């Protein structure tokens, strides 16, 4: 099929990737209301067009935690990313590296830290959950440091997993899931060969290395469910702050008071995120949550925003709402599932071109120029 926009990759991935993996990325929790609002709330934000300004020298680059980024975005941590393309985390990391943006490796990646880090030139970021098994956390941090990971992304909005009903229907979970996945592989032969056969082993690389045995896809949800820690508090993060010398970002902030706590804690950044609508359904979209958080802590801590970003215009919207940078999750997974590394590189090119158009027609030469004034206050119309 013809790919003319990043959204086309979703349809391409739906055709190529078996349902149990496509819907794992595409779906949200419960009735998926927050998942829908993440997208619609961004779409409904109007940009303020300004013309007859000299926009011949336009710059989308930023500096974040001492790193130069070609555009204000980071590839977000996505679990089991290696099931969307052969050794998918490596391909996505190489695409990000080639386009000058960071890649964040998930705790529950298929490819382990030691496989991904040597495949790229720039340091990758590493994402970690708060888990009951503190030994695993310490081991993961030590390995991330040894591999040269530059920034730690600490996900705090998963003390318990959300209920993802769509996974029950698709075969990711639910009755007869194993045989349903096998049958789906027969109807998706290219994926079955490229990922199912050539992409082995299908284990959680970081977990398997620590456990000394293979932890596969069937163990994935069970292992996470058993290890999520509902007793987590800011105090539990103190030993990590002492252990990790580099930048530390707290992911999963939706309330200004939590953002202030992150500043007091000494975090270097936060990610305003509802986990892509995959945790508590019914919470605010990131676009709605972002402005009051920016009012509370802008300038005291770096603000990254994710959830609902589907094009370069959405990145500009998030920046105008108060973010310093953004994270892309589903957008790059669709591209990865559809066309591997090349797909992710092309998707990033598309996003950057769309940013150029939006910045030109809102008369913002640099990322620092993008302020709330780039938006139209529809309540006054």
From Swiss-Prot:
Stated membrane topology is: Peripheral membrane protein
Q: Does the keyword Nuclease apply?
A: no
User: Per the annotation, which location comes first and is thus the protein's main one?
Assistant: membrane
Claim: Lipoprotein is one of the keywords in the record: no
**CDD domains assigned:** alpha_hydroxyacid_oxid_FMN
BP terms from Gene Ontology: aerobic respiration; lactate metabolic process
The enzyme's main class, written as a single word, is: oxidoreductase
Any one Gene Ontology MF annotation carried by this entry is: L-lactate dehydrogenase activity
Q: Which reaction does it catalyse?
A: (S)-lactate + A = pyruvate + AH2
UniProt-listed Enzyme Commission number(s): 1.1.-.-
Q: Which UniProt keywords apply?
A: Cell inner membrane, Cell membrane, Flavoprotein, FMN, Membrane, Oxidoreductase
Family that this chain belongs to: Belongs to the FMN-dependent alpha-hydroxy acid dehydrogenase family.
Q: Indicate what this protein is called per its UniProt record.
A: L-lactate dehydrogenase
List the source organism.
Haemophilus influenzae (strain PittGG)
Organism classification, top ranks?
Bacteria, Pseudomonadati, Pseudomonadota, Gammaproteobacteria, Pasteurellales
């Amino acid at each position: 099929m013809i790919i003319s926009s990043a959204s086309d990759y979703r349809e391409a991935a739906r055709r190529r990737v078996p349902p149990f993996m496509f819907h794992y990325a595409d779906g949200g929790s419960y009735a998926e209301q927050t998942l829908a609002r993440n997208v619609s709330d961004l779409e409904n934000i109007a940009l303020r067009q300004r013309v007859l300004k000299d926009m011949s020298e336009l710059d989308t680059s930023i500096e974040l935690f001492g790193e130069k980024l070609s555009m204000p975005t980071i590839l977000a941590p996505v679990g089991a990313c290696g099931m969307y393309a052969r050794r998918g985390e490596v391909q996505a990391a190489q695409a990000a590296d080639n386009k000058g943006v960071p890649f964040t490796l998930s705790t529950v990646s298929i490819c382990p830290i030691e496989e991904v880090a040597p495949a790229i030139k720039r340091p990758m970021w590493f994402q970690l959950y708060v888990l009951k098994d503190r030994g695993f956390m310490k081991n993961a941090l030590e390995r991330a440091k040894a591999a040269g990971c530059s920034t730690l992304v600490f996900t705090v909005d998963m003390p318990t997993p959300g209920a993802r009903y769509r996974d029950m229907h698709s075969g990711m979970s639910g009755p007869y899931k194993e045989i349903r996945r096998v049958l789906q592989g027969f109807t998706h032969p290219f994926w079955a060969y490229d990922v199912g056969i050539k992409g082995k082993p299908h284990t959680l690389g970081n977990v398997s290395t620590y456990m000394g045995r293979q932890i596969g896809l069937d163990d994935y949800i069970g292992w996470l469910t058993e290890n999520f820690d509902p007793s987590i508090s800011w105090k539990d993060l103190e030993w990590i702050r002492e252990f990790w010398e580099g930048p530390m970002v707290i992911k999963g902030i939706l309330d200004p008071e939590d953002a202030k706590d992150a500043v007091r804690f000494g975090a270097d950044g936060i990610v305003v995120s509802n986990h892509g609508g995959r945790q508590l359904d019914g919470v605010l979209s990131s676009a709605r949550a972002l402005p009051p958080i920016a009012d509370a802590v802008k300038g005291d801590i770096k603000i990254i925003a994710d959830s609902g970003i589907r094009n370069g215009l959405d990145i500009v919207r998030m920046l105008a709402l108060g973010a310093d940078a953004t994270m892309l999750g589903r957008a790059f997974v669709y591209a990865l599932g559809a066309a591997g590394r090349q797909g992710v590189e092309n998707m990033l090119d598309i996003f950057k071109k769309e940013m150029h158009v939006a910045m030109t027609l809102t008369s913002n030469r640099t990322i620092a120029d993008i302020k709330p004034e780039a938006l139209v206050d529809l309540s006054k119309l």
